[in-house]
Protein backbone atom coordinates (compact mmCIF):
# COMPACT_ATOMS: atom_id res chain seq x y z
CA UNK A 1 0.00 0.00 0.00
CA UNK A 2 2.87 2.20 0.51
CA UNK A 3 3.52 2.24 -3.14
CA UNK A 4 -0.02 3.34 -3.76
CA UNK A 5 0.28 6.17 -1.15
CA UNK A 6 3.55 7.30 -2.62
CA UNK A 7 2.07 7.31 -6.07
CA UNK A 8 -0.96 9.26 -4.81
CA UNK A 9 1.22 11.82 -3.03
CA UNK A 10 3.47 12.17 -6.04
CA UNK A 11 0.41 12.87 -8.20
CA UNK A 12 -0.84 15.44 -5.70
CA UNK A 13 2.56 17.15 -5.62
CA UNK A 14 2.69 17.17 -9.39
CA UNK A 15 -0.81 18.69 -9.55
CA UNK A 16 0.06 21.40 -7.04
CA UNK A 17 3.28 22.16 -8.92
CA UNK A 18 1.42 22.48 -12.22
CA UNK A 19 -1.22 24.68 -10.59
CA UNK A 20 1.40 26.99 -9.06
CA UNK A 21 3.30 27.08 -12.35
CA UNK A 22 0.12 28.05 -14.21
CA UNK A 23 -0.62 30.74 -11.60
CA UNK A 24 2.90 32.14 -11.94
CA UNK A 25 2.65 32.14 -15.74
CA UNK A 26 -0.72 33.91 -15.48
CA UNK A 27 0.75 36.52 -13.13
CA UNK A 28 3.73 37.06 -15.44
CA UNK A 29 1.40 37.43 -18.44
CA UNK A 30 -0.75 39.95 -16.53
CA UNK A 31 2.32 41.95 -15.51
CA UNK A 32 3.69 41.85 -19.06
CA UNK A 33 0.35 43.07 -20.45
CA UNK A 34 0.24 45.88 -17.86
CA UNK A 35 3.82 46.89 -18.74
CA UNK A 36 2.96 46.84 -22.44
CA UNK A 37 -0.09 49.06 -21.88
CA UNK A 38 1.93 51.44 -19.70
CA UNK A 39 4.64 51.69 -22.38
CA UNK A 40 2.00 52.39 -25.05
CA UNK A 41 0.47 55.11 -22.89
CA UNK A 42 3.89 56.67 -22.30
CA UNK A 43 4.66 56.57 -26.03
CA UNK A 44 1.28 58.14 -26.87
CA UNK A 45 1.81 60.84 -24.24
CA UNK A 46 5.27 61.61 -25.65
CA UNK A 47 3.85 61.71 -29.18
CA UNK A 48 1.07 64.09 -28.11
CA UNK A 49 3.52 66.33 -26.24
CA UNK A 50 5.86 66.42 -29.24
CA UNK A 51 2.97 67.30 -31.53
CA UNK A 52 1.84 70.08 -29.20
CA UNK A 53 5.37 71.47 -28.95
CA UNK A 54 5.78 71.40 -32.73
CA UNK A 55 2.43 73.16 -33.21
CA UNK A 56 3.36 75.82 -30.64
CA UNK A 57 6.72 76.37 -32.35
CA UNK A 58 5.00 76.67 -35.73
CA UNK A 59 2.54 79.23 -34.39
CA UNK A 60 5.31 81.22 -32.70
CA UNK A 61 7.33 81.22 -35.94
CA UNK A 62 4.31 82.44 -37.90
CA UNK A 63 3.65 85.19 -35.35
CA UNK A 64 7.28 86.30 -35.45
CA UNK A 65 7.31 86.31 -39.25
CA UNK A 66 4.07 88.33 -39.36
CA UNK A 67 5.44 90.83 -36.84
CA UNK A 68 8.61 91.24 -38.92
CA UNK A 69 6.53 91.71 -42.07
CA UNK A 70 4.35 94.33 -40.37
CA UNK A 71 7.40 96.19 -39.03
CA UNK A 72 9.00 96.17 -42.49
CA UNK A 73 5.84 97.58 -44.06
CA UNK A 74 5.65 100.32 -41.43
CA UNK A 75 9.29 101.25 -41.94
CA UNK A 76 8.88 101.25 -45.71
CA UNK A 77 5.82 103.50 -45.48
CA UNK A 78 7.59 105.92 -43.12
CA UNK A 79 10.61 106.06 -45.42
CA UNK A 80 8.39 106.68 -48.44
CA UNK A 81 6.55 109.50 -46.67
CA UNK A 82 9.83 111.07 -45.53
CA UNK A 83 11.23 110.92 -49.07
CA UNK A 84 8.09 112.52 -50.49
CA UNK A 85 8.24 115.27 -47.87
CA UNK A 86 11.93 115.94 -48.58
CA UNK A 87 11.32 115.97 -52.33
CA UNK A 88 8.43 118.40 -51.91
CA UNK A 89 10.50 120.76 -49.81
CA UNK A 90 13.39 120.56 -52.28
CA UNK A 91 11.01 121.39 -55.15
CA UNK A 92 9.64 124.37 -53.26
CA UNK A 93 13.09 125.63 -52.29
CA UNK A 94 14.42 125.16 -55.81
CA UNK A 95 11.42 126.93 -57.25
CA UNK A 96 11.75 129.81 -54.78
CA UNK A 97 15.45 130.13 -55.50
CA UNK A 98 14.80 130.05 -59.22
CA UNK A 99 12.01 132.62 -59.00
CA UNK A 100 14.04 134.92 -56.75
CA UNK A 101 17.04 134.68 -59.03
CA UNK A 102 14.85 135.23 -62.05
CA UNK A 103 13.29 138.32 -60.49
CA UNK A 104 16.68 139.64 -59.44
CA UNK A 105 18.07 139.02 -62.88
CA UNK A 106 15.07 140.69 -64.52
CA UNK A 107 15.39 143.69 -62.23
CA UNK A 108 19.10 143.95 -62.97
CA UNK A 109 18.40 143.61 -66.66
CA UNK A 110 15.80 146.34 -66.62
CA UNK A 111 17.90 148.72 -64.51
CA UNK A 112 21.27 148.37 -66.16
CA UNK A 113 22.84 148.07 -69.54
CA UNK A 114 25.89 146.49 -71.11
CA UNK A 115 28.12 144.89 -68.52
CA UNK A 116 25.48 144.79 -65.78
CA UNK A 117 23.02 143.18 -68.16
CA UNK A 118 25.53 140.45 -69.00
CA UNK A 119 26.23 139.84 -65.32
CA UNK A 120 22.51 139.45 -64.62
CA UNK A 121 22.12 136.95 -67.42
CA UNK A 122 25.05 134.96 -66.12
CA UNK A 123 23.58 134.94 -62.61
CA UNK A 124 20.26 133.84 -64.04
CA UNK A 125 21.97 131.06 -65.97
CA UNK A 126 23.88 129.97 -62.88
CA UNK A 127 20.70 129.96 -60.81
CA UNK A 128 18.90 127.97 -63.47
CA UNK A 129 21.84 125.57 -63.51
CA UNK A 130 21.60 125.25 -59.71
CA UNK A 131 17.86 124.68 -59.96
CA UNK A 132 18.38 122.09 -62.66
CA UNK A 133 21.07 120.43 -60.55
CA UNK A 134 18.71 120.22 -57.58
CA UNK A 135 15.97 118.85 -59.82
CA UNK A 136 18.38 116.38 -61.38
CA UNK A 137 19.54 115.26 -57.94
CA UNK A 138 16.00 114.48 -56.88
CA UNK A 139 15.00 113.00 -60.23
CA UNK A 140 12.43 115.67 -61.04
CA UNK A 141 13.50 116.35 -64.63
CA UNK A 142 13.05 114.66 -67.95
CA UNK A 143 16.31 113.05 -68.98
CA UNK A 144 15.95 114.44 -72.54
CA UNK A 145 15.97 118.06 -71.34
CA UNK A 146 19.18 117.68 -69.34
CA UNK A 147 21.39 115.79 -71.77
CA UNK A 148 23.20 119.02 -72.67
CA UNK A 149 23.77 120.12 -69.06
CA UNK A 150 24.24 116.84 -67.20
CA UNK A 151 25.76 114.07 -69.28
CA UNK A 152 25.17 110.65 -67.83
CA UNK A 153 27.19 107.50 -68.06
CA UNK A 154 24.14 105.27 -68.35
CA UNK A 155 24.25 102.82 -71.22
UniProtKB/Swiss-Prot annotation:
Keywords: Repeat. Highest expression is found in seeds. No expression detected in adult tissues. Induction: Up-regulated in response to water stress. Disulfide bonds: none annotated. The keyword Repeat applies. Residues 97-120 have a biased composition (Polar residues). InterPro entries: LEA1/2/D7/KIN2. Residues 53-74 are annotated as: 2 X 11 AA approximate tandem repeats of T-A-Q-A-A-K-E-K-T-Q-Q. Belongs to the LEA type 4 family. PANTHER family: LATE EMBRYOGENESIS ABUNDANT PROTEIN (LEA) FAMILY PROTEIN. This is Late embryogenesis abundant protein 2.
Amino acid sequence: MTSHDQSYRAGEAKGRTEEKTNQMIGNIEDKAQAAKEKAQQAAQTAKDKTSQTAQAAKEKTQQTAQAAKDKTQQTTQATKEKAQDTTGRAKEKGSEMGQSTKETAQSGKDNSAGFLQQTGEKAKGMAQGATDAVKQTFGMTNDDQDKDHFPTNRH
